[in-house]
Amino acid sequence: MSTISDFNTAAQAGIDREHEVQLSLLRTLCQAIREQRSTSEVAQLLGHFSDYCEAHFVSEELIMRQHSFEEYEDHADDHCHLMDLLRVIATDWETADSSSLKASTDEALAFIENHISTRDKRFADFLHRAE
């Protein structure tokens, strides 16, 4: 029979893998933009990354709510901010605003790396203590 500790450990490992996938997808998107790949390829990568983030954020926020994580609102606000950045990237791509596009992709990458190393780490530590 599984325990809450087993669930927490599995949830934390799953979330960590999802963070690795998120970073990989975003780096691939940034590279495609830098290399000025086709509109359809960039649109597909952006859509895939956006969809992945939405699914990840829903699952992560559900676990936070289940555990009454005290930093939930600030953490969820970060998720909203990243989704806003993705909309900016999409607009910059569609309007061919290359200087703004470079700035927005750089900002998104720096933001998610910082988010994972700070907020997500605190959440992982919280889950670990909850075991």
Regions found by a protein language model. Give the residues of each.
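Small-residue-biased structural context
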Residues: 1-131
